[in-house]
Amino acid sequence: MLFLKNIGVFFMIFLVSKSYATDCNKITNEEECHKSSECIVINYTPCCGEQKWACSKGTFDTCTYENSCYRNSSNNQVVEVSNKCFNLDGFIKITTPTEYSCSDAKIKECALLGKSCSFQKNSCSNPTSCCPGESICEGLSSGSSTSGGGSSGGTSGGSSSGGTSGGSSSGGTSGSSSSGSSSGGVSSCSTTHCPEGYHCSMVNDVATCLASTTGGTGLPGTSSSTAGVSSCLTTLCPIGHICVEDSNGVNCVPNGGGTSGGSSSTGTSGGHPDPCRDVDCPDGFHCECKDGKTAKCVPSPTTGSSSTSGGHPDPCKDVTCPDGFHCECKDGKTAKCVPSPTTGSSSTSGGNTNPCSNVNCPDGFYCECKDGKTAKCVPSGPTQPPKPPVCSLRCPPNHECRFNDQGHQCCVKVHHDRCSLRCPHGHECKVDHNGKECCVRSHRPPPPEVCSLRCPPKHECKFDDHGKKCCVKIHCDEVCDLDCGRGFECKIRHDGSKCCVRSERPHPPQHEKCNKRCPPGHECKVDQHGKECCVVAHRPPPKCSLRCPPRHECRVNHFGEECCVKVHHDKCSLRCPPGHECKVDQHGKECCVVAHRPPPKCSLRCPPKHECRINHFGEECCVKSRNDCLTCEDLNCERKGLHCAMKTVPIDKENCCEKVPVCYSTNPLLDGGHGFI
């Protein structure tokens, strides 16, 4: 039983640790990938492209050097990777890097065509080992004399006098040259036999044996339609060509427009037959062309991982299809070049056609073409949001006009509670449209300045928040008795709290009349926030004459009445140094402050080089002088045959000697005529 329990605990720990594991492939920030202890940054390079990076799971100890080639399943792009931990989604490992020479299989392939193999390096500035160049079959070998096709004089170039080049085939095999001008219907994968490890594909309408990237297929006699072989994922096209799947199988066709040899099946003349080629859709959209002439940006399917490396959400954005084909992405992640519909006039013969004329952008975007060839969908509409409509219905009390979800006007009940803020005189509490309480100036006229109700003892007449007269109890603690510092004075706010404010303040505006009724010795003021408060007048307040019990003192309250209030602080108990005295501040804290009386004089007679001081406890004592100034006795000038004099020092600072002793001679030969040594 204990064993089963331990297994269960271990299984739960395994599940928890697995749930908290880092998914390195989802990290799109290179710095975050470096910081993660479970992930490693791996660089990869496309053919003739700039280096990129990917975040993969692993460490520097486990992820060692291994040069490999991968193909992106979404756009058939081949990349070179130098780390064995590379596992980016959508990439399939295809081959190991090839040598910079013709392989034995390519030599056999060229021999079957009666040609010799020649390796041509890639012309870009940074070719990778995964696509260093291409092996091509060119010329006639020395032993091939069976060229059927009317060559004049048996020249090695295979050029016929009739103007067709390379039209001869030997033994029914695909003997057309690589120039792409074969006579239609001569070469076909159904009659082409490739060596082991190769399969047949149509390159420029010529049956060509290409290296298979999956083992076990491509036996002699298999065509491009054999199961497992007819796929762009297992086809390596020559440099400058792209793999296309159509109803006839797998074909390698030239990549890009403008190439000579109008082998396009669309019947177009000039321009770009693919309308989506120069259309830049916004993020979340991709270009589709279903009628062969109108490009339309449509929403991309929302899949979980349509872009694994933080690139463009539209897989067709980085795919260039050949003439007669256009890119489609139906599942949101796989870009595929499909034949364009054969329309009579997919592009006009004129060269000044507006690229935006056949582009439909999504809602909120419009087509823009700044370079004359690239159509781009950019956000449209005003730069500022439109003003909201005004609700104009007249609603009953406690209701307000609002727009419902359908945009219709209706009266709804206001659900907020009563406003609970306590506002100053002349203001009232309101709840705004966001439900927030605030004090606003009242629209009703202010109450009269004098409250005329006769109230009982220890009560006074006041106006409530609605302007009505009422008697309220007088509180004896409303005297502004804070001990404020110099330059400050005590004030009582409208809510009864006390505060110290700076005395030198700008006077309130003259049009704001202060309406608060203040006690004798006080006056009404409007502070910098527009609040009314009673402050001590600059004239002395009336003297308080009541005799109060111990720990109490006589005070004049806020309304001019005398009363005894309790003293809340005890006697100050701090022992302060001379010249200081103990005080209790407005917070009840004891502190030593400088006394306004002069400090006591020290009367002790002290020995030489000492002085009388009063210590921290008020006791007199003799201490050694801080500035022990030298005298002539200290120098012993007479023993040297010199005279001594006290010279004034031009420094007027505390603890500095006013004079210093100097030895001098009257003989100018000894001191250079200066008189001092």
Curated annotation (Swiss-Prot):
Q: Which GO terms describe its cellular component?
A: extracellular matrix; spore wall; transport vesicle
List compositional bias (Gly residues) regions by residue number.
148-174
* Keyword list, A-Z: Cytoplasmic vesicle, Disulfide bond, Glycoprotein, Repeat, Signal, Sporulation
Subcellular location as annotated: Cytoplasmic vesicle, Secretory vesicle; Spore coat
InterPro entries, alphabetically?
Answer: Dict_spore_N, Fol_N
Q: Which residues form the Follistatin-like domain?
A: 188-210, 231-253, 275-298, 315-338, 355-378, 418-440, 479-501, 515-535, 571-593
Q: Does the keyword Disulfide bond apply?
A: yes
Where do the DSCP-N domain residues begin and end? 22-142
The known PTMs are summarized as:
Disulfide bonding is important for associating SP87 with the coat.
Where do Low complexity bias regions lie? 175-184
- Signal peptide: which range, if any? 1-21
Using the UniProt annotation, give all residue ranges assigned to the region (Disordered): 148-184
What domain of life?
Answer: Eukaryota
Q: Which Pfam families match?
A: Dicty_spore_N
Kindly summarize what the UniProt induction comment says about this protein's expression.
By cAMP.
- Glycosylation is annotated at 72
GO biological process per UniProt: sporulation resulting in formation of a cellular spore
What function does this protein fulfil? May contribute to the structure of the coat at the interface between the middle, cellulosic layer and the outer, electron-dense, proteinaceous layer.
User: What name does this protein carry?
Assistant: Spore coat protein SP87
Q: Which organism is it from?
A: Dictyostelium discoideum
